[in-house]
Amino acid sequence: MAAVMALAVLPRRMTRWSQWAYAGRAQFCAVRRSVFGFSVRSGMVCRPRRCCSSTAETAAAKAEDDSFLQWFLLLIPATAFGLGTWQVQRRKWKLKLIAELESRVMAEPIPLPADPMELKNLEYRPVKVRGHFDHSKELYIMPRTMVDPVREARDAGRLSSTESGAHVVTPFHCSDLGVTILVNRGFVPRKKVNPETRQKGQVLGEVDLVGIVRLTENRKPFVPENSPERNHWYYRDLEAMAKITGADPIFIDADFHSTAPGGPIGGQTRVTLRNEHMQYILTWYGLCAATSYLWFQKFVRRTPIM
């Protein structure tokens, strides 16, 4: 339609070729105006029409983005504060558990219960038994390092020695209960693993023992599988050990006073727990304080953060 109107006002002296060119240009400008919002006038360069509300819309969008970023970044100090508070609760729980274990280990020994199911609630509890060892069926848990019970308690779980060896586990027939249990007699260095090298320490006859009740142990990551065929044990698997020796799946760690001259060194039970929650508390609360300060500078004081 715009092209027809343009032809109507053309001078008559224009050639037909000029009329076609002028009409084509008018048609082209009309299309650009309808599609792209350009305004075209004769003899002028086509320029875009400016929208008065574009600046206001841009400012509103920027304000909305800043508001979202402000509340999103506030999640960082809030989360850090929550994790720090959680670590406070975890530390209280760990201290309570450590105190409970210490009181349990220091308690007076009780007779070994006849019902094995009762042992599930007696881990780390001292028990006393009477009977004799069967040294022909020794098992070896390795590698292990020796622990001095006195230094172990004083130094919160640090190893007393770096010498590698094994724990000697021996079937023990309880004469009063009529059952055979497994007793971890203690540590021997690698050169003394062979029982022929420590015949003096192979206790014979009936003896009274005090030991700490231990439950079965799950294999930890990177720990090899047990090898019963080679008599190499890397973790405490009571069911498998009981099957090999013919004993019941009851396990105790003999205390230090059970040590015989030339035999395994008893008292190798570690009852301390790692308590590093204070480090985590300082880390999370420190992160909360730092990110809260940065958030305040950025969104409250509007100070540019380099």
Curated annotation (Swiss-Prot):
InterPro entries: Surf1/Shy1, Surf1/Surf4. GO terms for cellular component: mitochondrial membrane; mitochondrion. The keyword Membrane applies. PROSITE patterns: SURF1 (PS50895). Keywords: Membrane, Mitochondrion, Transmembrane, Transmembrane helix. Disruption phenotype: Results in smaller animals with mild decreased motor skills, enhanced working spatial and recognition memory, and increased longevity. Increases global and regional cerebral blood flow. Increases lactate levels in blood and brain, and increases glucose consumption in the brain. Increases hydrogen peroxide production and succinate dehydrogenase (SDH) activity, but decreases COX activity and respiration. In the brain, increases Hif1a and phosphorylated cyclic AMP response element-binding protein levels. In the brain, increases resistance to calcium-related excitotoxic brain damage. One of its GO terms (molecular function) is cytochrome-c oxidase activity. It comes from the Eukaryota. It is found in: Mitochondrion membrane. It is a multi-pass membrane protein. GO terms for biological process: mitochondrial cytochrome c oxidase assembly. The chain crosses the membrane at residues 68-86, 280-300. It holds the Pfam family SURF1. Component of the MITRAC (mitochondrial translation regulation assembly intermediate of cytochrome c oxidase complex) complex, the core components of this complex being COA3/MITRAC12 and COX14. Interacts with COA3. Belongs to the SURF1 family. Component of the MITRAC (mitochondrial translation regulation assembly intermediate of cytochrome c oxidase complex) complex. Regulates cytochrome c oxidase assembly. This is Surfeit locus protein 1. It comes from Mus musculus (Mouse). The gene is Surf1.
